[in-house]
């Protein structure tokens, strides 16, 4: 089993998205759904970190991977001696912004 670590930036993105959906919907039901799916994704990554698709931002030196969560979100991560989550990304955002955040 691999160790999993969220970067501070990824944690902020994750909690910002959860907060947005609580405010937007006036309830926490969709945020709870996101949280459950993220927990499932974390379990998958700890046991099989290569399950995510190689991301287009990868290079020969930095292999960046992406795991889809609920169609609209992605966990962006890299594998070193652990699984390091670099970003929790809303796929509707501008992809150019993602590159500036993780590279």
PLM segments and residue spans:
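Basic, Lys/Arg-enriched alpha-helical interface segments
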Residues: 1-63, 103
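Basic/aromatic recognition patch in beta-strand/loop cores that engages polyanionic ligands
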Residues: 51-81
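Enriched for short, Lys/Arg-rich terminal
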Residues: 69-103
């Amino acid at each position: 089993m691999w160790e999993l670590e969220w970067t501070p930036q990824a944690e902020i993105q994750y909690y910002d998205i959860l907060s947005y959906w609580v405010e937007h919907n006036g309830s926490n039901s969709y945020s709870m759904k996101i949280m459950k799916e993220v927990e499932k994704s974390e379990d998958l990554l700890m046991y099989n970190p290569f399950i995510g698709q190689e991301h287009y931002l990868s290079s020969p030196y930095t292999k960046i991977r992406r795991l889809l969560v609920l169609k609209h979100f992605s966990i962006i991560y890299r594998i070193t001696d652990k699984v390091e989550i670099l970003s929790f990304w809303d796929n509707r955002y501008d992809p150019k912004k993602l590159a500036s955040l993780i590279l």
